[in-house]
């Protein structure tokens, strides 16, 4: 075996947490249930803890700190810091730094901490079980987080905080309820194991199972079932191309409770500056991917010159739409700059600017609609192509 094939030694602490605790849960939780039983109080509190831990990871660690998708009030930050520590997935600083590295180097088997290219098991939890990385942390990509007092306080007190949230709080709850062991097993142990693997599904299954409507440049996939399990994180293909959007599920019907929580917090002053990617950019990504697939599919087939020509005409039209949108954005930015510089202070100029901005808005909406219609035409074109191929077979 050469040096490159030698695996690093096991990380004993992580082995105890990510292997030892699930084994303990598989044995102890059913045994206590058989001989003593659990009541509704314990199950409900286990679900409450699971929800608070999970949403603090998705809404706090992930969308707030890793991606800066919105701003949060100090109260909301402290809430996420405490309950996120209860998820036992490391401090905000370490978690967010790793996640930023994952996005920057996605699918790179050397630089991506949990690259899907190294397999389902590795991306799920294998990357944590061995000492694959140096013991010297690199937070060069998280200097903004190092200036956040909430992040740094949690990082410095993480061990005490996570111990209290995972053991101390369930014990106190058990004392109040009158069954310490049963409460610790459900609210502490089982809840923690479930919470771990729900999060790990995003690193693993969401890179192997699902669709890629927005980009095929990486392995991330959209999966509605995983979104249901992971508080809305399952729309992963969208997230990897538009990571600063506070939403993962962008349609009203897509299950994304994290998005709804952030939006609700913004209504009561706990969150602000929610980032939303424009509909035009979303449509552009979908069409760009669809055109790429259509070209590849038609290139493999012989004949169909008329359909291929239609496809190229549609693509040229798509390019024209993109150029128009780029020009409109440049014009919009220039007008905004002029307004901020005080160049349009007179009432007449303000009225003129309002009219021009309304006209720009109309043009943007027209372009968005044009892309939407082009998606339908492209779909019909591919249906024609598929029918033609079926007849030729």
Regions found by a protein language model. Give the residues of each.
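Interfacial helix-loop-helix junctions of multi-pass membrane proteins
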Residues: 205-210, 242-247
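Generic hydrophobic/packing signal
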Residues: 56-58, 204, 223, 233
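Membrane-interface module
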Residues: 90-94, 224, 241
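Short amphipathic alpha-helical "interface-anchor" segments enriched in bulky aromatics
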Residues: 235-243
């Amino acid at each position: 075996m050469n040096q490159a094939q030698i695996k690093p030694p096991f990380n004993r602490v992580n082995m105890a947490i990510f292997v030892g605790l699930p084994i303990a849960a598989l044995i102890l939780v059913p045994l206590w249930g058989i001989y003593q039983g659990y009541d509704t109080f314990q199950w409900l509190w286990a679900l409450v803890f699971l929800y608070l831990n999970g949403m603090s990871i998705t809404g706090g660690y992930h969308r707030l700190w890793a991606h800066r998708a919105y701003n949060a009030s100090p109260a909301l930050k402290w809430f996420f810091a405490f309950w996120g520590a209860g998820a036992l997935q490391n401090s905000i600083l370490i978690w967010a730094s790793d996640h930023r590295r994952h996005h920057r180097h996605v699918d790179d088997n050397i630089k991506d901490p949990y690259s899907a290219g190294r397999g389902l098991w590795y991306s799920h939890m294998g990357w944590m079980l061995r000492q694959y990385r140096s013991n010297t942390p690199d937070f060069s990509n998280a200097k903004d987080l190092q200036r956040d007092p909430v992040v740094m306080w949690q990082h410095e007190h993480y061990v005490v905080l996570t111990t209290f949230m995972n053991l101390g709080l369930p014990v106190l709850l058990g004392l109040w309820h009158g069954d310490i062991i049963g409460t610790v097993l459900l609210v502490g142990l089982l809840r923690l194991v479930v919470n771990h693997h729900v999060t790990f599904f995003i690193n693993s299954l969401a890179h192997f199972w699902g669709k890629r409507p927005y980009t095929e440049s990486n392995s991330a996939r959209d999966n509605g079932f995983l979104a249901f399990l992971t508080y809305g994180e399952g729309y992963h293909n969208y997230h990897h191309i538009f990571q600063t959007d506070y939403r993962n599920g962008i349609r009203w019907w897509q299950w994304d409770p994290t998005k709804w929580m952030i939006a609700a917090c913004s209504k009561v002053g706990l969150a602000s500056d929610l980032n939303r990617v424009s509909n035009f950019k979303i449509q552009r990504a979908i069409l760009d991917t669809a055109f790429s697939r259509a070209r590849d599919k038609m290139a493999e087939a012989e004949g169909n010159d008329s359909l291929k020509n239609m496809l190229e005409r549609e693509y040229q039209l798509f390019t024209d739409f993109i150029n128009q949108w780029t020009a409109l954005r440049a014009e919009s930015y220039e007008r905004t700059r002029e307004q901020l510089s005080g160049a349009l202070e007179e009432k007449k100029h303000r009225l003129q600017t309002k009219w021009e901005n309304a006209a720009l808005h109309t043009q943007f909406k027209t372009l968005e609609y044009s892309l939407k219609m082009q998606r339908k035409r492209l779909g019909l074109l591919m249906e024609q192509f598929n029918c033609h191929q079926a007849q030729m077979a």
